[in-house]
């Protein structure tokens, strides 16, 4: 809830299978627990850094999904090889640089957020146009206007990573799609004059 400056996040160490609404922890943007009896996720500081840096974000998902994590572990961006990718991501989904020993041994989770933000700033990317990132040697984070959209983007990211992996097996020299095809597919859904859908 951006107006109230509050974030609802999963509790640390509680298995998803047994998780209920009562387990959810509410924190403020400084990480102080406002509601709940459980400790918040160990990744809370990463989430808070992203909420502060990217005002359009209303929900964040961090996974270790198989195919996207392969790209993260390889330290590779996820290129836009086709229109499935271009419908959601306006270009390659970036992979961050490797974190330094000092960053990892220091405030690791906050520094994970910082390296994501640094990646977007240095590459001139916006979190609205590329609603996901791959953290090198770690895994993907995806986001959206709310939690439902964040999950949706995480699912699409995983499918795009799976298709990209197999595309490279068939065509190791495959290049990303042409910019005009990327523009056409992304902008018809997300541009100022979007034509996709009924609204």
Label each region the model flagged.
Residues 1-199:
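Glycine-rich flexible loops
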